[in-house]
Amino acid sequence: MGMRPPSGLPSLSRRSRVLLVAAVVLAALLLLGPRFTDAYTNWLWFGEVGFREVFLTVVVTRIILFAAVALFVGATVWLALLLAYRTRPVFVPMAGPNDPIARYRTTVMSRLKTFGIGIPVLLGLLAGLVAQSNWVTVQLFLNGGDFGEQDPQFHLDVGFYAFDLPFYRMVLNWMFVAVVIAFFASLVTHYIFGGLRLSGREGTLTRPARIQLAVIAGLFVLLKAVAYWFDRYDLLSSSRKEPTFYGGSFTDINAVLPAKLILLAIAVICAVAFFAGVVLRDLRVPAMAAALLVLSSVLVGAVYPLVVEQFSVRPNAADKESEYIERNIAATRQAFGITSDKIEYKDYKGESDKNPLDVPVDAATIGNARLLDPNILSPTFTQLRQLKNFYGFPESLDIDRYNLDGNLQDYIVAARELSPAALTGNQTDWINKHTVYTHGNGFVAAPANRVNKPQSEDVAAGGSSDSGYPIFLVSDLFTPKDRQRIPVEQPRIYFGELISQSDPDYAIVGGAEGQAPREYDSDTAQYTYTGKGGVPIGNWFNRLAFAAKYAERNILFSSAIGDDSKIIFNRSPRERVQKVAPWLTTDGNAYPAVVDERIVWIVDAYTTLDNYPYAQKTSLEGAVEDSIDKKTGRLLPRKEVSYIRNSVKATVDAYDGTVTLYEVDSTDPVLKAWRGVFPGAVKPESEISPELRAHFRYPEDLFKVQREMLTKYHVDNPREFFTNNAFWSVPSDPTIEGGSFNQPPYYVLLGDPKTNRPVFNLTSAMVGYNRQFLSAYISVRSDPDDYGKFTILRLPTDTQTQGPQQTQNTMTTAPQVSQEKTLLSNSNKIRYGNLLTLPIADGGILYVEPFYNERNTGPNTATFPQLLRVLVSYRDQAGSVKVGYASTLAEALNQVLPGAGSLATPFGGDPATRPQPGTAPPVVDSTQPPADGGTPQPQTTPPPTGSAAKDAAAAELDRKIEAVRNAMRSGNFQDFGKALEELEAAVKTYQDAGR
């Protein structure tokens, strides 16, 4: 007896359909609206910075990749559904009136196009959305070339692994995805329409269903055979022997590699067996093939390599792995740029019987010993050169060098930026925050090897209030250009690290025609931006787009926005470089420099790979993290790399935001590939001006990665490498309390043994593996002539030279140091500066550490670090470790090396001219900015005696009164309170002097 087919799902009413459509449209607007807004504003921004071709190339590549994968996956699924539907049985027996399959079948039949086309389209769209993120893989495949280096196993060029293999893997993966989805789509369709029935003791499968499923399964196994072929190449990046070494090991090459070929052959045989299911009615052949494939994968692919590893390799690991460790050493050195042609190894005694006076090169090293720590002095810069409460400096300052008097001098440098976090009260109103307080003002520098004058010996007082401070050199709006020792044509700063911390990050500049200037410039003047940076928002469409982007209605309705207005956003130098060159990884630290009288930010950028054969893989985040990053919370790149090059250096103009990319490594194959993708985006090295090149530094993050690699890969002998007994370690920072963090590398000026002139180096001490004794000293040059040249001083293993942590303990426990520290700790915060390791005396090691104090005068009083003492440590030839401790480097040196203090640079003097050793330059009062905000002039301070003492006290009183007035004008209550306290002290001094 026939049965009435079950009814389908109830249809929706007209009102329900309208509401459903409205809900779908609203959801689409909510999901896609922000994306379209971002796309349009990015289009405008890339046009403003002149990199629209980059934007178009990326977008077009993503669209093509999206369309190709979506079409491929969607078409494959559609074809599978179509074949399954067309070959369905004509008559389908029903299990009963409540058969759930019949109900689903009726529903599908009633909406055949919805299911037959909608499902493939939806799956295709999802696949396309995922695939479009692989645009980098596609472009590198299309534009990649050769490295000129071959892998030691298959003798293929490294370019195959870097550019080709990832693309083949991507294509293979999407074929797997399409085949797997098609298989399950066919299976479900055949089940719904009766081609596959599971009723009874044994299920039944129609011939069309068997053929279709067998063919798809055979295709899957064929793809698996291809995957086994490519798996062979992936063995050269095996992590089986981590953490000992990276790359193919004995087991990988002698067991896993043959196993892959065996499995490939088995997979081909199994695929033939599945295809045989097309003509054979017996499914046992494909079933046996599937079982064979699984069993062989376990036995051949897993058990056999395990047996080889356990019973052949482990008992003889040093011998078995020796060849493969050699491969790993050679590849890692090549991939990380630490080959023998770039590194000069020198044996270094760690002790000497010479005096630095007898070694000509030491005059440059000691004379430029850095006493200012850029990671401590930000509060000092802020308090003494802030000018207004809304200006500020980054938490960690920078180091650069300038040649102002014919001698190279390193400076602590910073841009005086607008600090959004410092805005208070009505300054945070939208109109003020985004249209008035729009830019910073000036470039500030201080010579790194001296302060204005030494602290007094009165330790209990915590030092004097006008000594131990940097000697500032300022180029800003208030300093006439003829008085600027570092001339700056345009000191206004619209782009920087600090100003970009505004949330949201944008400023609106310009205004309606004839409108008065609005942007704050000084207490008596406003300014209107005239630079080429910024996106025009004079038209209503752009205003609407940015109002939607920032969810800010004021952008639409504010009268401060006129026809000539522009919006400046993406103001972080690193972010700007990362956006115009998304294929680069930027260094974590951009630094300001004055180049051709303009303030620019210099950003180091890297090309990287994660699949260089046999090269060690490391995490950038882990390799570059040190004590400074922990303090500042600097964002670190989170990616694994096995190849890195600093092939590009970028500049960002601080006024108009212009981004310029320069090639600095023409031999980098990865950069060559990207220049093929984005022709014209990177300027050739020949366009780098000598003025700009003079400010290039060897990048910190790259150095830290290479330093991490050199802890192991300085070893040549694979047996020593395997035992770890010759490894080094990065020392922990001994100046940090409350945790163990890597000591950061330090930029210092070291004497060049060939010329006896100072050379700007990035340096790091290295200690023995899991030990604290000094094992090596790494330095890399930043001067244009020998840029990137490493020198590694290797200390002997039969003597023990103290490392940074041991030296810190020795210095801080010295009787004089510990006694003064106890006296100071009651009313001062003690801060140790960077512990520098300096090679001197043709074999000796000198440690230099500045000792800062910061007064504890109350919770509402502004305090800031000042240099109080200088600590030095030196080990003589007899093995005795001597500690020097004084208010100047010269005095401290004389305590450990008699007479060597004459090589140290005296304190005080003109910030642009280095005083000659042994002279007494004029003392500079750095605590009071001049009336025009410029650079203070040196003032000679004679020793007060008799009536002169009263005159000096009176002059000091006048200065403190003027300081109170300046604090009142600035509106900074912290400065005002501090100025009042200092005025009271000056009054008492004057009264005492008159008695």
From Swiss-Prot:
Q: List, as start-end ranges, the regions of compositional bias called Low complexity.
A: 927-938, 946-955
The terms describing its cellular component in GO are: extracellular region; plasma membrane
Q: Which UniProt keywords apply?
A: Cell membrane, Membrane, Transmembrane, Transmembrane helix
Region spans: Disordered: 904-957
User: Which cellular compartments is it found in?
Assistant: Cell membrane
Transmembrane intervals: 18-38, 63-83, 115-135, 176-196, 211-231, 260-280, 288-308
User: What Pfam families has UniProt attached to this entry?
Assistant: UPF0182 (PF03699)
Q: Where's it mainly located?
A: membrane
Its record classes its membrane topology as: Multi-pass membrane protein
Query: Where does the signal sequence lie?
Result: none
**Known PANTHER family for this protein?**
UPF0182 PROTEIN SLL1060
Entry-linked NCBIfam families: PRK00068.1, PRK12438.1
Family indicated by similarity: Belongs to the UPF0182 family.
Q: What name is this protein filed under? A: UPF0182 protein NFA_45260
